[in-house]
Amino acid sequence: MAASPLVRFAPSPTGFLHIGNARPALLNALFARREGGRFLLRLDDTDRERSTEEFATAAAEDLGWLGIEPDLFFRQSDRTALYDTAAERLKAAGRLYPCYETPEELDRRRKRQLGRGLPPIYDRAALSLTEAERAAFEADGRQPHWRFKLDHRVVAWNDLVRGESHVDCASLSDPVLVRADGSYLYTLPSVVDDAEVGVTHVIRGEDHVTNTGVQVQLFEALAAAVPAFGHHNLLTTADGEGLSKRLGHLSLRSLREAGYEPAAVRSLAVLTGSAEAVRPIASLDELAGLVDLAHLSRAPARFDPAELDGMNARLVHDMPLEAVHERLAALGVPAEAAEAFWLAVRANLGRVSDAAAWWQVVNGPVTPVIAEPDFIARAADLLPEAPFGPGTWKAWTDAVKAETGAKGRALFMPLRLALTGLDHGPDLAALLPLIGRERAVRRLAGETA
């Protein structure tokens, strides 16, 4: 790769980022990481009514949670002068022309075209307006919106994901670049920014393929270098529905608050719909090494929350204490007990936050379940003296087995119910020393402790 790549992720701060946004953000950031390039975070905040500072701040925070730290950052709202200059250049070249139709007029025109079996594309009627007609519209209070005059030709490129691709621009309406109120739609600011900062690779969802035909012509009209384009498959719900910011439970913020690990979200967002086996990858560098745009599937990539649960659990089961000690402390686990507790319970966790329930089992209060009072009373008499250690459980259960003849489930389940109040959980050989003799005695006696 000749030049050091510069890629970008450009969300609109009109809602919280969701798992579908994470895919292009990660593909870009990991591509830059692998190729020794840079990553630009650009806020496309030209929608003045819907863009908010809350969502802008949240976007940066959520990307940081995923491990994405931009090398460059800017907002489009700070760069209007650049867009104004580009728009004037296009007007002077005859590529940006004023139109005065109302939305209702355009809708009626589209319906007439469809009724005649014609494609519903803009007919360029505004190009035939005389100066007098334009003046009359403006005297009537109409302000023009501005369309980019497309060359009616095929735009072709070698897509980084899809291979040889093309768009026949003769089948497209001339796109509106400037609204009647003077604000800009997505297309012109995006091209101006990419050209001005030198974006080399535009990696985005396949829903932008048609936009690429338009944008290539815009780059050329502005005498700017055309970047390489790659259009990846989109994440959908498990049912095949498109993801949107309205799906709050799949927002990155909600996933973080629900206790998912960023590595699990990263791995699933990137590897789903690729040639790689979907598996948890903790290291960003390792995950970056697996990003091969040419091997992404053309089929939609289905995001299944159940798969995320499994991925998260696999990560948690392998986590060392160093990765979780602060979170355990926040749950009330003292430093001196943290290692033994974590090693005891992590294989039973789906999320680190689930450890809170097991700390309560250890620390109490627990209401015991005494399913077999006589058996538990005999077992209590055989409970070893303090201090408890790794061999205490085996020594105790061997003694109980010899005394009562109980074995297997008949031996272990009544003891588990009495000590934890539950019929499942971590290995009691590891839990019993954490519970301690005093609590064990009280629970075996049927007391809440």
UniProtKB/Swiss-Prot annotation:
The UniProt annotation puts motif 'KMSKS' region at 242-246
Q: Which reaction does it catalyse?
A: tRNA(Glu) + L-glutamate + ATP = L-glutamyl-tRNA(Glu) + AMP + diphosphate
Stated EC number for the protein is 6.1.1.17
The record, for PROSITE patterns, names: AA_TRNA_LIGASE_I
Instruction: Motif 'HIGH' region — list its residue ranges.
Output: 11-21
Q: Which UniProt keywords apply?
A: Aminoacyl-tRNA synthetase, ATP-binding, Cytoplasm, Ligase, Nucleotide-binding, Protein biosynthesis
User: GO MF terms on file?
Assistant: ATP binding; glutamate-tRNA ligase activity; tRNA binding
Family assignment from sequence similarity:
Belongs to the class-I aminoacyl-tRNA synthetase family. Glutamate--tRNA ligase type 1 subfamily.
Role this protein plays: Catalyzes the attachment of glutamate to tRNA(Glu) in a two-step reaction: glutamate is first activated by ATP to form Glu-AMP and then transferred to the acceptor end of tRNA(Glu).
UniProt protein name: Glutamate--tRNA ligase 2
Source organism per UniProt: Methylorubrum extorquens (strain PA1)
